[in-house]
Amino acid sequence: MVIEKEVRKMKTDFKQHEAKLEITLEGELNTHSAPELDAKFQEIKDSVSSIDIYMERLTYITSAGLRILLAMEQEMEQKEGALVLHGVNSEIMEVLEITGFDTILEIV
């Protein structure tokens, strides 16, 4: 299953392979785009136990975006699954470090 969708200033690409979900984010994960990302996640969360998020093209993240990542992490933790962030650039990493999310989320 491949779903592509424009989300305000952010493009998301969801690919689900059985219980594994791959999400590619491009643009800004902000107050406008986070709710739509969350809505899509809520639709499919029951069918996944592992999430890989590819962030190479993510240019900006706000607290709304961080909340979505935390919710995804908590959901996967309940299922004894995993959430892994890939390709985090230096600007996004700085936000994750300042907020302490680098100690909560698995980043490779």
Where are these regions (language model features)?
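Short beta-strand/loop segment at the start of cytosolic alpha/beta domains
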Residues: 1-24
